[in-house]
């Protein structure tokens, strides 16, 4: 059957009460964050977040990145080669074993996979039952690519991502055009919340206003003054305020969980060797 890939009832999201008392825990909003921010943009400016980004950022600064693709974009978009949606044998074993047999870190992974927070962030929002699996080719469908799902389906090139973060790393302006004020960048990249994150396996993620300021296991946080975001398949983009440089890595073949950010980590290390 056709699965709903995005929220269509914004009022339902607006009526949703916090799952936990605000300020008591940190829980990653895998999909809903983009709709919440996008609705603010739409009500203030009148344009959708995808249209606003296209007209005010992508076109003005020559950044090859879109939220909601047109036919021309689709014609040059690489297909994603995702891992099977079914739990692999190792995960199945972890879920089946009693907790007293598991190391503490593996126990945390198991508890997170079984938790309501994980299901709400990654499964229920996509209307997928925890016993179901999405078809592995759903990100390659035209309906997914054309939709505006700001927190999940932005499409772009590594150079486009690097250019975006490079502009932010250099003060927010380029060629006499301003993307963001330096004070706004400083505020947005100052940690506002810190893990352990109840969705992201209790890892000590640090978030600013949308940006990851420290993302364990990835390049983000290996140096002072870094901010950016990681992707579910292993993609990574970040800015380094101290070195005034942007970084972008994209991959169309999803990396396994144990090697998720291995390539971006290796590339980032080489970058800093050069710098």
Identify the residue ranges that each predicted region occupies.
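Hydrophobic core segments within long, regular secondary-structure runs in both alpha-
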Residues: 10-14, 268
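Cytochrome P450
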Residues: 23-32
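Cytochrome P450 catalytic-domain "roof"
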Residues: 15-24
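Divalent-metal (Mg2+/Mn2+/Ca2+)-assisted nucleotide/phosphate chemistry catalytic cores
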Residues: 1, 12, 35
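Long, well-ordered core segments of solenoidal/helical folds
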Residues: 13-14, 60-61, 65
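Short, small-residue-biased leader/transition segments that mark boundaries at the very start
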Residues: 2-7
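Hydrophobic mid-domain F-helix/FG-region of cytochrome P450s
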Residues: 32-43
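Catalytic loop of the DD-peptidase/beta-lactamase superfamily, centered on the K-T-G motif
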Residues: 25, 42-60, 68, 72-275
């Amino acid at each position: 059957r056709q699965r709903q890939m995005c929220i269509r009832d914004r009022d339902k999201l607006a009526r949703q009460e916090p799952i936990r008392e605000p300020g008591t825990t940190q829980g990653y909003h895998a999909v809903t964050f983009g709709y919440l921010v996008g609705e603010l943009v739409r009500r203030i400016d009148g344009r959708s977040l995808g249209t606003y980004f296209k007209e005010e950022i992508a076109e003005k600064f020559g950044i090859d990145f879109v939220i909601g693709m047109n036919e021309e974009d689709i014609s040059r978009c690489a297909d994603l080669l995702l891992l099977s949606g079914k739990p692999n044998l190792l995960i199945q074993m972890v879920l089946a074993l009693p907790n007293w047999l598991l190391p503490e870190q593996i126990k945390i992974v198991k508890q997170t996979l079984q938790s309501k927070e994980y299901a709400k962030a990654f499964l229920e929002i996509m209307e997928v039952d925890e016993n179901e699996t999405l078809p592995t080719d759903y990100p390659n469908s035209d309906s997914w690519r054309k939709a505006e799902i700001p927190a999940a389906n932005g499409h772009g090139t590594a150079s486009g991502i690097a250019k975006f973060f490079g502009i932010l790393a250099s003060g927010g302006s380029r060629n006499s055009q301003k993307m963001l004020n330096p004070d706004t960048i400083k505020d947005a990249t100052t940690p506002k919340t810190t893990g352990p994150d109840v969705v992201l396996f209790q890892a000590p993620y640090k978030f600013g206003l949308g940006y990851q300021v420290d993302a364990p296991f990835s390049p983000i946080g290996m140096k002072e003054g870094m901010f950016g975001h990681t992707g579910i398949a292993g993609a990574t983009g970040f800015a380094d305020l101290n070195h005034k440089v942007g970084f972008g890595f994209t991959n169309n073949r999803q990396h396994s969980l144990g090697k998720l950010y291995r390539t971006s980590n290796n590339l980032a290390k080489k970058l800093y060797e050069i710098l």
